[in-house]
Structure formats: C-alpha cells, structure tokens
UniProtKB/Swiss-Prot annotation:
Origin: domain of life: Archaea
UniProt xrefs under Gene3D superfamilies: 3.40.50.1970
Statement: the UniProt record of this protein carries the keyword Isomerase: yes
A GO term, aspect molecular function: 5-(carboxyamino)imidazole ribonucleotide mutase activity
Enzyme Commission code(s) on record: 5.4.99.18
Protein name: N5-carboxyaminoimidazole ribonucleotide mutase
A Pfam match: AIRC
Gene coding for it: purE
Keywords: Isomerase, Purine biosynthesis
Family: Belongs to the AIR carboxylase family. Class I subfamily.
SUPFAM superfamilies named among the record's database cross-references: N5-CAIR mutase (phosphoribosylaminoimidazole carboxylase, PurE)
Binding site for substrate: 18, 21, 48
C-alpha cells in the first residue's frame, strides 16, 4: 500500500474518503505539524476501496500508528469500518455534505454499535480531531502534553487580550477595526 508520508515513522494516520475531503482534513495535518508530531495522510474509500480500508486498519498498528483520524461525508462509514478492524483509537470527522449540511455524516459516525467506539468531533472540525489525537498521545509522550499546555495557555492569553481591547474600545470601535 502506498501512502503519502509526512514522516517515515508516523504516530497519527489521517485518512479520508475522498480528495474532496482534503480542504477540511488538511487542518488536522497543520495542527500535527505545528506540534511536530509525525503523521501520514491518504485517501481510503470505505465503499469504493474496501480492501484498502481493511489493509490500512489491519497494518496501522504494526507501522507504529497510535491514533487514526478518519474524515468522511455522506454515508460516512470510513471511521466505523476502520474502528471495527483495529484496537487503535479512531477519531471521526464528519464532513459537511451538500444534501444535509453534514448532519448525515455526523449521525453516521456518532451512531456506532456497542463495542465499536469512534470518538467524534464537530462537523468539519479536523482541527479538534488533531487536538484530541494529541491529548491521547500526550498520555504516553510528556513532551506532547507540555506543548498542549503551552497551546492552551496561548489560547487563554489571546482571549484575554481581545476581552481587554473590547472593554477599552467598546463594541462599535472594536468591530470597525
């Protein structure tokens, strides 16, 4: 199986059902890059390439993958299929669809049968999927946990700065800048 490799020894697998999902899923890759966590990224269709999905799930752990982020739209079976084939944590990213604005994708991923868990983030929220993957990895890798602490502190600082500006300027001036 040929996989687009960001690293020779990836810890996270980012997979998606179609290349049309890439504009959403790239946000997971960006976060992992920001944190210096190696990953791989590829396309696997649960419906069009089920053998590829099977092979990916079965071999992910032996390749060193520790968490899988799976994005899919519409019927969105990819995260569930992968979760049914591996003991690795799978994080599902529902991709917004034209027909139902992603509600179909969300429900397909959330409504897994007992015994086949898939952690699910908000529609099109690959960024949170990557942050959740980092929290999972942080259990084993203290340096990732420390980077997450700094990331959260930085978020807090930015919000506090914005709050101070708004309070000083008033809402009309704040919005006009």
């Amino acid at each position: 199986m040929v996989i687009s490799m960001k690293s020779e020894k990836p810890l996270v697998g980012i997979i998606m059902g179609s290349d049309s999902d890439l504009p959403v899923m790239k946000e997971a890759a960006r976060i992992l890059e920001e944190f210096g966590v190696p990953y791989e990224i590829t396309i696997i269709s649960a419906h069009r390439t089920p053998e590829r999905a099977y092979e990916y799930a079965k071999k992910a752990e032996e390749r060193g993958i520790e968490v899988i982020i799976a994005g899919a739209g519409g019927a969105a079976h990819l995260p569930g299929i992968i979760a049914s084939l591996t003991v690795l944590p799978v994080i599902g990213v529902p991709i917004k669809s034209k027909a139902l604005n992603g509600l179909d994708s969300l429900l397909s991923i959330v409504q897994m049968p007992s015994g086949i868990p898939v952690a699910t983030v908000a529609i099109d929220n690959a960024k949170n999927a990557a942050l959740l993957a980092l929290r999972i990895l942080g259990i084993k890798y203290p340096e990732i946990k420390e980077k997450l602490r700094r990331y959260m502190k930085d978020m807090k600082r930015k919000v506090e700065e914005k709050a101070k500006r708004l309070e000083e300027m008033g809402w009309e001036r704040y919005l006009s800048e």
